[in-house]
Each structure stands twice: as structure tokens, then as C-alpha cells.
């Protein structure tokens, strides 16, 4: 949301991407200036950062004992933002009010199974229209909880999930990522019991498996 408010463009990427091909291509092709990454995925970025000259900073979500020259913790970004807003709240308000419906908000990449991945440009109006459409078919109230069991780099997850629930004032929970795909799948029933969601965002294959288990 901070990136969108600032007029920037999000480029969500899958944690499954390999650094030497898929990840490197997407960072270079999108002209990304900043990379936000977890500690678990940081080694991938460190291996290819020398080949990404346009990347200015790597922002790490988890605290580390030491940071390399071009890395910084997310806590520092938050502190910088709070300090900036104390004296520049009007400037920031003018910035996000200048963002128009046709300005780019997101680049979503195709899988690239037969050729180089294609970057799909989505505007702010793409997002708001999808949220309005989602609100017409997803009935929920403020305070409701949605469990998302889909890859978060997919448009369906962050539009029908994150942004639609935000428009309602709802909450979002995600499934913890395991060391393997099977481990992640095993975390789904654990998350359901813990979160007790009113809504689950799924795809037909997973929904069929749930139905078989219920029947």
C-alpha cells in the first residue's frame, strides 16, 4: 500500500523463482529500483544483485545481525517514513492525491513456460474495478476474516483477497510456507483451525479436494 500511495509500481514475485533465470529476468525487465525480501529469500537476491545495476536498495523484512552495503531493515524504512510525515504530511497527501486511475500500479508476470515471461501492466483503475466486482460477489462484513491459500504473487490473491477485504474493513490471514510444497499443504488445515475464517480464497482443484474431505 505504501508503494501505491507513493505512486510507485508493485512487482509481486513468487518465492519459487530461481535466481539465475526467472528472478533475474523479472528484476531487470521491470527496471526495479528496490527489492523487498524476507531473510529466507535474501540469499537468492545476493547472488544476482551485481547483475541488477538499477536496484538501489534491498529492504529486508526480517532483522539480521549484519547487513551488506546496499541492504537495510524494514524497521528503518518505517522510522524514516514516520519522521518524514511529521514535517511533510501535506507533501505526502499531495503525492497520493496526484495518482490517477490510469497510472500503473502493478506488473504481473506470466509463467514464461514457452518464452520469456510477459509483464502485464495493471492500472489503479484495474484494481479498484476488480475490488468493486469482488465486493458484488463476496458478502462479508467489517471484522470478517479471509484465509488466503493461494500464491500471493497472483492477481487473484491480492485483488480478490487483500484489497477486497481491506475495502470491507476485514482481516486477511495466510498459510505459513513450509520447506516443501507438501509441508505447505499440510499447514492449510492447521491454519483453518487457528484462524477460523469466514471466507477462504481458493481455486477449483483445491476446492474439490476440500469437498471430497467433507463428503
Region spans (language model):
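Helix N-cap/beta->alpha junction signal
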Residues: 38-41, 103, 203-204
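Conserved S/T- and glycine-rich ATP-binding loop of Class I adenylate-forming
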Residues: 3, 35, 104, 110-113, ...
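Short hydrophobic/charged patches on amphipathic alpha-helices used for structural packing
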Residues: 24, 46, 93-96, 189
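Structural core segment of the AMP-binding/adenylate-forming
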Residues: 5-80
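A short helix-loop-beta submotif of the ANL/AMP-binding
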Residues: 1-20, 28-34, 144-145, 163-176, ...
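Conserved AMP-binding/adenylation subdomain of ANL enzymes
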Residues: 128-147, 152-215
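Conserved AMP-binding A3 loop
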Residues: 105-131
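Conserved pre-ATP/AMP-binding loop-to-beta segment of ANL
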Residues: 60, 75-109, 116, 139-145
Amino acid at each position: 500500500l505504501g508503494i501505491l500511495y507513493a505512486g510507485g509500481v508493485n512487482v509481486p514475485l513468487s518465492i519459487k523463482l530461481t535466481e539465475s533465470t526467472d528472478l533475474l529476468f523479472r528484476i531487470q525487465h521491470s527496471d526495479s529500483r528496490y527489492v523487498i525480501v524476507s531473510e529466507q529469500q535474501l540469499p537468492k537476491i545476493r547472488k544476482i544483485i551485481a547483475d541488477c545495476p538499477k536496484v538501489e536498495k534491498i529492504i529486508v523484512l526480517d532483522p539480521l545481525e549484519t547487513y551488506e552495503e546496499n541492504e537495510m531493515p524494514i524497521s528503518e524504512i518505517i522510522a524514516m517514513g514516520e519522521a518524514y510525515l511529521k514535517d511533510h504530511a501535506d507533501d505526502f497527501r499531495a503525492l497520493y492525491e496526484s495518482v490517477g486511475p490510469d497510472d500503473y500500479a502493478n506488473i504481473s508476470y506470466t509463467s514464461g513456460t514457452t518464452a520469456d515471461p510477459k509483464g502485464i501492466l495493471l492500472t489503479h483503475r484495474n484494481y479498484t474495478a476488480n475490488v468493486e466486482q469482488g465486493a458484488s460477489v463476496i458478502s462479508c462484513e467489517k471484522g470478517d476474516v479471509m484465509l488466503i491459500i493461494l500464491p500471493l504473487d497472483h492477481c487473484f490473491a491480492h485483488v480478490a483477497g487483500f484489497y477486497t477485504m481491506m475495502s470491507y474493513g476485514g482481516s486477511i490471514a495466510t498459510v505459513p510456507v513450509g520447506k516443501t510444497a507438501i509441508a505447505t499443504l499440510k499447514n492449510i488445515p492447521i491454519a483453518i483451525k487457528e484462524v477460523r475464517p469466514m471466507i477462504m480464497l481458493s481455486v477449483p482443484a483445491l476446492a474439490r479436494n476440500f469437498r471430497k474431505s467433507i463428503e
